[in-house]
């Protein structure tokens, strides 16, 4: 019996040590609280420095007023091609934005699967340049648009619309988590 008691005590000690080690390990910190509205978002500070590094984004530039947003250059979403990522915060409902886009010639808008309960639409409207956009519903009076496009004249390779949309699909959950909570 003595051997069995030692074995049980040893297992208990190892389990406790493992639990203590797990408790003291570097767990990721919880995400910062969501802003209550788009007015609280500073567009060029939307991504953390770690995210900018991960997404290979640089040179943030505010959009020209009256537009509220920021533009970054990058190359992660299509190897060897320079791209531009634009975040635009809009004081208008997604429905109104979609209606305006829908009236544009050749508009191709499709609803995507919801991201953490938030409605999202993809804009693949053809134009002179290759681009893909996502429109995020915030509430009945505001929305956000994220657009990824080729940075014209910078590289010899050209991404396809499919390449750019794939990059946005990768970013969508991260962007959703930084927007105000969905309100109905």
Model-derived segments and spans:
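Bacterial N-terminal signal peptides that target proteins for export
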Residues: 1-11
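Polybasic, low-complexity association/targeting segments
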Residues: 3, 23-25
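Core hydrophobic alpha-helical transmembrane segments of single-pass membrane proteins
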Residues: 13-17
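C-terminal motif of bacterial Sec signal peptides marking the signal peptidase cleavage site
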Residues: 18-22
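A small/polar (G/S/T-enriched), proline-flanked helix-loop surface module common
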Residues: 26-184
């Amino acid at each position: 019996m003595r051997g069995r008691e030692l074995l049980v005590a040893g297992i208990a000690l190892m389990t406790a040590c493992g639990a203590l080690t797990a408790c003291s390990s570097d767990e990721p910190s919880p995400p910062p609280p969501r802003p209550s509205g788009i007015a609280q978002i500073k567009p060029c500070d939307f991504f953390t420095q770690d995210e900018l590094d991960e997404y290979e984004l640089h040179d943030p530039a505010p959009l020209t007023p009256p537009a509220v947003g920021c533009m970054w250059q990058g190359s992660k979403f299509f190897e060897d091609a320079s791209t531009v990522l634009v975040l635009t915060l809009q004081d208008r409902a997604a429905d109104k934005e979609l209606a305006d886009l829908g009236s544009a010639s050749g508009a191709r808008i499709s609803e995507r699967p919801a991201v953490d309960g938030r409605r999202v639409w993809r804009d693949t409207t053809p134009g002179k340049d290759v681009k893909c956009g996502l429109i995020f519903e915030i509430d009945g009076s505001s929305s956000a648009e994220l657009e990824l496009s080729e940075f014209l004249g910078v590289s010899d390779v050209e991404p396809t619309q499919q390449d750019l949309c794939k990059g946005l699909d990768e970013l969508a959950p991260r962007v959703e988590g930084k927007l105000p909570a969905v309100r109905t």
